[in-house]
């Protein structure tokens, strides 16, 4: 008995290119984007390939991901937690690690029942005092964790460059 082997990188005319190849590649509980409602690539043109869903370019907020920034004067983390209430979130600092945990029990939504849980850890930069870290939750579900960076002590000083007449590297003696 022959078994057909389907390679995900080979385009097949009767198989939509954008379909998830594994169960975990699907976006459960997330809203549809407008591009999800377009016809499949093979019905448009045999030469047109719509990019797969993981290559879409929505804003970071729509993806459920986090963004960590290290700016001149502060360290910050923005994390999309729109599916969690403030009571379902915990932010802790353990040594030089920030831990964010969110969990809600099973509840019913328009698609059925769903429960969610996540753990995220971020290393605090060496120039940020863990005791100064704060967090806030915006009305649109973005958790912001930030802390000020320590300023370098002392004024800036320009160091003059002197020129020497001898080379820095000397040739090795030949044998």
Curated annotation (Swiss-Prot):
Predominant location: cytoplasm
Name the domain of life. Answer: Eukaryota
In alphabetical order, the GO MF annotations are: metal ion binding; protein homodimerization activity; structural constituent of eye lens; unfolded protein binding
Q: Which Gene3D superfamilies match?
A: 2.60.40.790
Q: Which residues bind Zn(2+) 1?
A: 83, 111, 119
Q: Where is it located?
A: Cytoplasm; Nucleus; Secreted; Lysosome
Matching InterPro entries: A-crystallin/Hsp20_dom, ACD_alphaB-crystallin, Alpha-crystallin/HSP_16, Alpha-crystallin/sHSP_animal, Alpha-crystallin_N, HSP20-like_chaperone
PTM Phosphoserine: at which residues?
19, 45, 59
Region Disordered: which residues? 142-175
Positions of post-translational N6-acetyllysine modification: 92, 166
Q: Among the record's GO biological process terms, what is one?
A: protein refolding
| Residue positions where N-acetylmethionine is found in the record | 1
* Signal sequence region: none
Function, in words: May contribute to the transparency and refractive index of the lens. Has chaperone-like activity, preventing aggregation of various proteins under a wide range of stress conditions. In lens epithelial cells, stabilizes the ATP6V1A protein, preventing its degradation by the proteasome.
What is the recorded name of this protein?
Alpha-crystallin B chain
User: Corresponding gene?
Assistant: CRYAB
């Amino acid at each position: 008995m022959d078994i057909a082997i389907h390679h995900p990188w080979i385009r097949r005319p009767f198989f939509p290119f954008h379909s998830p190849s594994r169960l975990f590649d699907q976006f459960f509980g997330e809203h549809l984007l407008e591009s999800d409602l377009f016809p499949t690539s093979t019905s448009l043109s045999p030469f047109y390939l719509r990019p797969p869903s993981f290559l879409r370019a929505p804003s970071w907020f729509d993806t459920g991901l986090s963004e960590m920034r290290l700016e001149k004067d502060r360290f910050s983390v923005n994390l999309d937690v729109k599916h969690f209430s403030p009571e379902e979130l915990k932010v802790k600092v353990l040594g030089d690690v920030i831990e964010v945990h969110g969990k809600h029990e099973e509840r019913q939504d328009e698609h059925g029942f769903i429960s969610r849980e996540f753990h995220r850890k971020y290393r605090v930069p060496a120039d940020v005092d863990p005791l100064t870290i704060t967090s806030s939750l915006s009305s649109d579900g973005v958790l912001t964790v930030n802390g000020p960076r320590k300023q370098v002590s002392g004024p800036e000083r320009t160091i003059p460059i002197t020129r020497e007449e001898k080379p820095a590297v000397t040739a090795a003696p030949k044998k």
